Amino acid sequence: MARERRDSKAATFFCLAWALCLALPGYPQHVSGREDRADWTQEKYSHRPTILNATCILQVTSQTNVSRMWQNDLHPILIERYPGSPGSYAVRQHIKHRLQGLQAGWLVEEDTFQSHTPYGYRTFSNIISTLNPLAKRHLVIACHYDSKYFPPQLDGKVFVGATDSAVPCAMMLELARSLDRPLSFLKQSSLPPKADLSLKLIFFDGEEAFVRWSPSDSLYGSRSLAQKMASTPHPPGARNTYQIRGIDLFVLLDLIGARNPVFPVYFLNTARWFGRLEAIERNLNDLGLLNNYSSERQYFRSNLRRHPVEDDHIPFLRRGVPILHLIPSPFPRVWHTMEDNEENLDKPTIDNLSKILQVFVLEYLNLG
């Protein structure tokens, strides 16, 4: 961002309920194209979600638990974690451990590299977690896990970046945990279109500037990974297509966790996907699934347009990747201050946004 500026019985019930969701009629299902269909890299532009019915929505949202997320994922991330710090290593190990322990069988990789910074060469490590590496197309959900570097303070305080971006990291881990069974179902599917489309979670290092935001002092992790993906053949063995062409939609989360956020539209070419978030928010409210919520303060507002903000999506945008940027406008009042901490987070808002995001992901992956 341009920033100076439960048990086995319960498990069986869930599986049966999910099978019922998949069997229920009355909702449009994704129809696979001809076997000789055109270039697969173009399918993202005509992709249609499978709209979840009320039964499925109720089942999905019953699996998420914001208090468990708070304890198991948010607290371990709410530490100083600028690139190269002990906290950065600890958070990176936590993210990998949580993802590797899931039944879906994620491929979790570290993308480690060195880059020149105002403080000399530093080592950075992105975390890329892929549900099915053999799938041609991937929905990408991303955030950054580093915190902005602040010199030692006289009062001993450290910057933990609660909204920036500990909460998005925790939300992504909770998404993977709470959707573990449907995502396992997706991975085991061998028939198109499900076998052709999967999910990728990316946790970027080095989003923040060390000194002053500039093209060379910012977005270290995303710049490196975008370049790498643009030159890595995909699917394996391909000669003319690369990993970056396999990104269907790049959903970037940032500055999330404060009360009453407003998310505007930043990119018109992905406005239809923003519209799905808006519709899901409305549906969840109608079902009574949003806490401490007023429709007068809705989160996603398709009638609001804002100029793009520099963030980890930029290196991908420049390579033609469709972007859905979920960053509030205005920024939280605690942005880049020591007050961006746990005390200033709003748990109901985070819970609500987690539910919306999880439904969105299932719809996009045609798991409904």
Swiss-Prot record:
First-listed, main subcellular location of the protein, grouped into a coarse class: secreted
Catalysed reactions, semicolon-separated: N-terminal L-glutaminyl-[peptide] = N-terminal 5-oxo-L-prolyl-[peptide] + NH4(+)
Disulfide bonds: C143-C169
Entry-linked InterPro entries: M28_QC, Peptidase_M28, QC/QCL
Function, in words: Responsible for the biosynthesis of pyroglutamyl peptides. Has a bias against acidic and tryptophan residues adjacent to the N-terminal glutaminyl residue and a lack of importance of chain length after the second residue. Also catalyzes N-terminal pyroglutamate formation.
Keyword Nucleotide-binding: no
The entry's keywords: Acyltransferase, Disulfide bond, Glycoprotein, Metal-binding, Secreted, Signal, Transferase, Zinc
Family indicated by similarity: Belongs to the glutaminyl-peptide cyclotransferase family.
UniProt binding sites for Zn(2+): D164, E208, H336
Enzyme Commission designation: 2.3.2.5
Organism phylogeny: Eukaryota, Metazoa, Chordata, Craniata, Vertebrata
Glycosylation sites: N53, N65, N292, N352
Tissue expression remark: Expressed by the venom gland.
Primary enzyme class: transferase
Species the sequence originates in: Bothrops jararaca
Signal peptide: 1-23
Active-site residues per Swiss-Prot or TrEMBL entry: E207, D254
GO biological process, one term: peptidyl-pyroglutamic acid biosynthetic process, using glutaminyl-peptide cyclotransferase
Protein name: Glutaminyl-peptide cyclotransferase
Intracellular or extracellular location(s): Secreted
